[in-house]
Amino acid sequence: MNKINLEDKIILAIDGLNIQEAKLFLERCPNIKWVKVGLELFTREGPNVIKFLKDLNKKIFLDLKFHDIPNTMEAACYEVSKLGVDIISVHASSGYKALTSSKNASLDGANLASVNPPNIVGITVLTSFSSEEFRNDLDRKNSIEENVVRLAKLCFDAGLDGCVCSPWEAKRLRSIYKNNFELITPGIRTKTQNKDDQNRIMTPYEALKNGASRLVIGRAISKAKDPNKVFLDICNSIY
């Protein structure tokens, strides 16, 4: 794998910034190709942030984690797909009907807007959950990994393009789905970084070795004094 391909595998989370701050930040990070827009940033700035990032020729992971009844998810995916984003996240636990409706609606919306259709990925179990919290807070009898495997299968059967999981589960999922199913992994931390509010974490090298397709990295880069250097250092540490 060459360094150019590695740059395409890292998605920078910029949720803590407004548009002007994001503009200044991305000017300092010319090597970054992918940007994640989450609920905080999209709620603050709305669709304008998508237009802004597209004008910078960035690829966009719109991580709004839609989770609602099928009709509402269908309508939401239809609308945001018209913005020309590259990946949209929905909660896998919304069920088969909601997932298939979301996928089909994204194709229709993109077609209407004459943009490329986005990949739809399903959120399995949030990386902020520890095993104890997952068992006690949600009253789940099965392990996190077993639930991730079950939800990933639901995504695959519903025709989604991939799922979001922690790097801990990526190895097992990759053994099941080989290379025709995208595995996006948050919970990425460098060896010197605090885990913050994440629990099931790995280094970038470990996550890719486990089968992750793309890595979502936020504070390790966004809080750095020289973010572009840190980004390239991460690429070099994997290469």
Curated annotation (Swiss-Prot):
GO terms for cellular component: cytosol. SMART domains: OMPdecase. Substrate binds at residues 15, 36, 63-72, 127, 189, 198, 218-219. Keywords: Decarboxylase, Lyase, Pyrimidine biosynthesis. Its EC number is 4.1.1.23. Pfam families: OMPdecase. Homodimer. This is Orotidine 5'-phosphate decarboxylase. The gene is pyrF.
